[in-house]
Amino acid sequence: MSTFLRAVRDNIPEKDKSELTENDLKKWGLGAIHLRPYQLDGVKWLSLCMKNQQGCILGDEMGLGKTCQTISLLAYARGSLKMNGPFLVLCPLAVLENWRQELERFCPSLSVICYTGDKEKRAELQQNLKSDPRFHVLLTTYEMCLKDARYLKSWKWKILVVDEAHRLKNQESLLHQTLKEFTVGFRVLLTGTPIQNNLQEVYSLLTFIQPSVFLPEAVEDFVNAYADIQTEPALVDELHQVLQPFLLRRVKAEVAAELPKKTELVVFHGLSALQKRYYKAILMRDLDAFRTDQSTKTRLLNVLMQLRKCVDHPYLFDGVEPEPFEMGEHLVEASGKLSLLDSMLAYLQEGGHHVLLFSQMTRMLDILQDYLEYRGYSYERLDGSVRGEERNLAIKNFSTKDVFIFLLSTKAGGVGMNLTAADTVIFVDGDFNPQNDLQAAARAHRIGQTRPVKVIRLLGRDTIEEIIYSRAVSKLRLTDTVIEEGRFSLLDQAQSAASGLQLSEILKFGVDKLLSSEESSVQDVDLQLILGQSRDGQWLTDEEHAKLNESNEEEDEDMEGQNHMYYFEGKDYSKDPSAEDEKTFELLLEKQFAEMEDAEKEGRALRNKAGVSLSGPLINPARKKRPLTEAELEERRQKRQAAAAKRAKLQEERKKQQEELNYKKKMAWWDSCGYRSLCLPRVDSEGEDMEPDEDDHVSFSSTDSDHTAIRYVLGDVTHPQADREDAIIVHCVDDSGHWGRGGLFTALGLRSDEPRKQYELAGDMKDLELGNVLLFPVDDKQSRLCGRDYLALIVAQQRDKANKLSGIRLTALDEGLKKIYKAAKQKKASVHLPRIGHSTKGFNWYGTERLIRKHLATRGIFTSIYYYRRGSSHATVSSTASTTTPSSSKPAASSPSESPHSSSPPANREGLTKSAELSTTSHEGPGAPGLADFMRGVHVYFYNMAATEKKKLTRYLITYDGDEEDLMSSHVTHIVGEVESPVHKQELQDLLHQYPQALLVKKNWLESCFASQRKVSVSKYVIRLT
């Protein structure tokens, strides 16, 4: 008997039978839910754990109701044990709102405080709690817990609940160490994957919930005690006895058989000719990695990642997408995967299905989002870049509105996210860890789902995806065995089995068939035959399908029983690549080396080093092919042109019909709401008001008359300098309908209540299309003695679903200025603009100024551009009708002391929104300073870093003039990583051996640099691997 089993028996009494009933829980405040039998058993088990233990792990499979069981435990603690709190619940940001709603719905007698928000809001919450500490549950996120750990440590928590507790699998992590310092009576860990990788992670969870038995320093003893579990079967039962008091796990197949059936299948696709060219080129890029025995694993992993990107979409490589970058069929035709997905989504939409679409790569999500926009599919998106409030809104919209597709990264949002509105899950590409894919699929197939669910995986035939997938199959089967039978050491063997084959051999898989032809292998498929039939938006089950097609009964019976994510056609692809693959690859190597030797003799170096992008031209070996005659070439060209013209015409007709239908619906909606649009009418380019564009050839020199010159003013554009005429103030906004803060947004709000009111109303009524101009008076608070002031809001920017703001679109600005010209002419008004886009990096002020001059000044509209001096109590009224522009004239762009037309540097920019920075920076003078560049020369390669954390750090790094490298190379100066296992340690040692110039540091170094606004010494942050 091991010391661990002895300690468990000495310290943890046997659990008695619980007499707890659901009526008891209802009496103590639980309501609006009927617990299933297994859920009530779970609450009983949790209540018994509270009597004699410091903590426990509720490890039910995803979707079985761990949240409601935990809420029931809190109701029990308050009602039966007379605990009035405080209880602390930690969860991911994406499911925090779900926790709040379910706490209020299932147990309204528990008062809940959501501890979130910015620093000021949290300080206010702390003050309120200090004056009135009467609450039961404090609900917050891991990030807030780490930020305000000192404050949260001051409380004595009766119960601590950690949702998605696999975040604690590393006992050296900051979250694990921080929570250990809290004063806690009982700890509850919730995780659908209590065992993911190895015994160290299991012990990390155990030492967190029961530190008196599982001492932190005894982790090696625990691993050694059960390392030989396969050769000593007696250890299996012993390990079960150690875990049994602390871990409860049920799976859907055992306790939720009433859930609608989940069917899972793999659909293969070919590759386009472009993808095949890049696939071959990637394999040939780093030849030494395949030839030498000393090649590092990192170089091969780089090749592996590039191959995965190639199979997804070739546009993931810079320089591949043809210019100009316009949406078109080329986006679909360039990728075999997207070609198949295109057909599949059309079939699914026609059948009334709703889809979760997963990808590992955020750049692939960008391409998919472009595609969905192009096809006109309704969608929501959620990945690491989406803010918390936007996430909740996206989830709510998908669940309550008729949204066709939810676009997600596999790990985004947390595994507790409920998306049962979907009945179809599509994995564009798979995760190396099969547990992550299972968690993702469980967002749709969980309690609350009323329709059968279909899980579809898209795999590139004869590509790296096949063998990666088959290895995930192998790992998942071993993991299932471990969980069910207790043989935890098999997890380590699963890792070694997956890496037993040389990575260089894995990369050769399928090359014989894949590269036997350079033609596209994309084919049309019968989707009804592959995906199955559906009726009224629901997939038919095997039984229903058999009634429709008795001939398929035998086939359906064969598939039954193999209904899990990683059934792979009964084939074992984990074996070595075929002899044909090896032979084809060797022939490719020989040919490539021969070409390189010839090139070296001629003094040309053709071989690219590892890490170089694939944007350059690729070698495309000539094929022996009968040359076409001139007549045949002409015939082919004409056919292609005719087909392209036909597709374009049909697409244009469909687009026009859809626009007309949408317009009629919008007009009917506006009528029902009593809404009247303030948008200026569209200007007919051939109408009488549009004069010839002779201005395009006019030289803007000092010979311009005062009447046609732009006037440059030092003053406040919200109080235009006009005589007796009407004045139109111009401001650029985005299409989101959310009024900004700071800069011109705040100034306009002080001038009038109308700007925010009319803009947000137009946003609510979907009246903010790009190029629209809202025109309305702003004299409600302040007015001139003579003449009226109007505000023209040009919708010139776009904000996408990920809250990313575009630059000012000159085409939209051009259209808006045309409309303003017509309105100004009718009202005999002058036009007053801020210095649009000033100090915005890459902004085309020259083009903007030409548009203003073209549409306004040279056509007789009195036009003024304002510069605002910050820091002064009031704007200095100073103006001049200059015949030279600040952008092209040296005197006008001089320092404040040299010219009255320049403005002082801005004192504070923190209050400006991004939209304000782009469109209202007229409040910042030409002398505005740029961002700090203290990270210049720093090139960072991130290793084993969470995607959200990496994205955040990269954003700051680039802001301060540093660079992030996707591939390890001699340019890298710092490796920022996290070491969580011996495998990571070995890989990093190999990296540092190959690239000795790089320093291995903790992410805290970057955070310290950003916080102190200087490049700090790395001495305190270096990671020692010896």
UniProtKB/Swiss-Prot annotation:
Comp. bias regions, Low complexity: 877-907
The residues covered by the Helicase C-terminal domain are 340-494
Start and end residues of each stretch annotated as Required for ATPase activity:
608-666
Q: Does the keyword Nucleus apply?
A: yes
Q: Give the residue ranges for region: Regulatory linker segment (RLS).
A: 594-628
Entry's Gene Ontology molecular function annotations: ATP binding; ATP hydrolysis activity; ATP-dependent chromatin remodeler activity; DNA helicase activity; histone reader activity; nucleosome binding; nucleotide binding; poly-ADP-D-ribose modification-dependent protein binding
Q: Which residues bind ATP?
A: D60, E61, M62, G63, L64, G65, K66, T67
For the protein in the UniProt heading, the enzyme class is: hydrolase
Q: How is its activity regulated?
A: Adopts an inactive conformation in absence of DNA damage. Binding to poly-ADP-ribosylated histones activates the ATP-dependent chromatin remodeler activity.
Q: Fill in the domain comment.
A: The macro domain mediates non-covalent poly(ADP-ribose)-binding and recruitment to DNA damage sites. Mediates auto-inhibition of ATPase activity by interacting with the N-terminal ATPase module, encompassing the helicase ATP-binding domain and helicase C-terminal domain. Binding to poly-ADP-ribosylated histones upon DNA damage releases the auto-inhibition by the macro domain and trigger ATPase activity. Does not bind monomeric ADP-ribose and mono-ADP-ribose fails to release the auto-inhibition of the ATPase module by the macro domain.
Complex and partners: Interacts with nucleosomes; interacts with the acidic patch of histones.
- What PANTHER family does UniProt report for this protein, alphabetically? CHROMODOMAIN-HELICASE-DNA-BINDING PROTEIN 1-LIKE
Which protein, by its recorded name, is this?
Answer: Chromodomain-helicase-DNA-binding protein 1-like
